[in-house]
Design a protein with these regions (language model features):
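Transmembrane beta-strands of outer-membrane beta-barrel pores
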Residues: 26-32, 56-60, 91-97, 111, ...
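Cleavable N-terminal export/targeting peptides
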Residues: 1-21
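Short glycine/proline- and aromatic-enriched beta-strand/turn motifs that initiate or cap beta-hairpins
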Residues: 20-62
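Outer-membrane beta-barrel "beta-signal"
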Residues: 230-242
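Membrane-embedded beta-strands of outer-membrane beta-barrel proteins
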Residues: 39, 72-74, 78, 105-107, ...
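Short loop/turn motifs that connect adjacent beta-strands in outer-membrane beta-barrel proteins
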Residues: 21, 47-49, 77-89, 112-120, ...
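Outer-membrane beta-barrel transmembrane domain signature
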Residues: 129-219, 240-242
Length: 242
């Protein structure tokens, strides 16, 4: 964890120097009964954009963090002023203590309203997972963001949905064969309200997220058990925009 902290500190320092969009979130997960610290950064440039986030999990019954998960992605687009400006190449790495490392490569398409209040990104990616057999080495991703929804200043709705192929072994069937699933789905819609606007602290937001997951509970068996079906995990907390 010390190496992770040093790495995150260096990344945040570089992000501030580059005038990137950075935020930190602290949320309480009601089902898993732990706190999750999330650090996010997004930076657009003349050649595309860079995005990363890191989740650090803090079980309340232990003094040390339980684990972490990280994603870092680079969108490459040096043809932004052409008719294909909405289409970018995409490269990504993700992994952590609770998930196998994976490399992803593919394309993304960015849609937005004229004032950029509403944004949607569609991704089609080749995905290879370390030490895992996949029937189809692909992932489909949707990312969205909406500002001032319903005409309410400071109310934002954002999130993502991922669908990919990955083999999970959940135990043994009655006939003795391994109980294996082949596809995974996860979505985490978030809603945040800029409560700080009322007392001269526009960085502060209150809100949370709900995680919808199918065949994704393997890392959380103490909570969900051998549940291969849809699991729902609500969380709430605070977000600080730097």
């Amino acid at each position: 964890m010390k190496k992770l902290f040093i790495t995150l500190t260096a990344i945040v320092a570089m992000a501030f120097c580059a005038n990137a969009q950075v935020n930190i979130q602290e949320q309480y997960d009601f089902n898993r009964e732990h706190l999750t610290t999330t650090l996010e950064m997004f930076k657009a440039d003349n050649w595309g954009s860079t995005f990363f986030f890191t989740d650090i999990y803090h079980p309340l019954q232990y003094s040390m963090p339980m684990g972490y998960y990280t994603e870092i992605a680079r969108s490459l687009n040096f043809w932004q002023d052409t008719k294909l400006g909405a289409l970018s190449a995409h490269a990504e790495w993700n992994g952590g203590q609770l998930a196998n490392r994976a490399w992803l490569f593919g394309a993304e398409y960015f849609l937005h309203s004229q004032d950029f209040r509403y944004r949607l990104t569609l991704e089609v990616l080749y995905k290879t997972i370390v030490d895992n057999d996949q029937d189809v080495p692909m992932q489909f991703t949707i990312v969205w963001g909406c500002d001032d929804i319903f005409g309410v200043k400071g109310l934002a709705f954002s999130g993502f949905a991922d669908f990919w192929w990955e083999k999970w072994t959940w135990g043994v069937k009655e006939n003795g064969d391994p109980d294996v699933t082949n596809v995974v789905f996860i979505s985490e819609p978030q809603i945040w309200y800029n409560i700080g606007q009322f007392f001269n602290c526009p960085n502060l937001n209150i809100g949370g997220e709900v995680e919808f997951a199918y065949n994704f509970a393997g890392a959380w068996r103490p909570v969900f058990g051998d549940n291969k079906e849809l699991t729902i995990a609500p969380a709430c907390g605070l977000k600080w925009n730097f």
